[in-house]
Amino acid sequence: MNTPGSVEYVPEDYFRALELATVFPRAGRLEVDLGCGDGAFLVAMAQRYPERNYLGTERLFGRVRNTARKAQRAGVTNVRLLRVESAYVVTHLLPAGTVSRFYVLFPDPWPKRRHWPRRLIQGEFLEAAAAALKAGGELCIKTDDADYFGFIGKAAAGCGQFERGPWEEELPQTDFERRYVAQGRTIYSLCLTRR
């Protein structure tokens, strides 16, 4: 049951696309943080851009609850959270042509070759993301894994629905990014723009 003002959103039907007018109290540009983790990035973006709507997805219950508390403490009203696998949200729950920007920040690289089918960013996901994005919408990605970054670049080129460009906007760092930068790791980023 969804109550007014609640940050956590539970769809009435997980087999139909969301009706965004029921998710957010007001219309606005929609940005989606896939795998929002501890929620620091999501809440910081919601504070920076109060006129935009932010949807965070996370499969772990504890992370969803922690992020909800952060959003409530920050007083942001433009954040909603779904406790669902990110790939499922993109392929089944987001209506076509409604998303202005996706953020995929430090997804699990699944470094062993036999685990590559578990990687989030690959052909089917990219096709679904392109369908959910508005024309000119963006899929912004960061990782500390050079091999996965190369894999993503090849998958995006194979998809044919995106123009590849650099990520130029200075945005808040995630917990993982702060940790990896402190360890001296290289951070790879790109922004894919839907054609």
Give the label of every model feature segment.
Residues 1-32, 40-49, 69-96:
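S-adenosyl-L-methionine
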Residues 34, 57:
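Conserved beta-strand/loop positions that form the S-adenosyl-L-methionine
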Residues 37:
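Conserved glycine-rich SAM-binding loop
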Residues 60:
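Conserved SAM/SAH-binding beta-strand->alpha-helix loop
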Residues 148-195:
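Class I S-adenosyl-L-methionine
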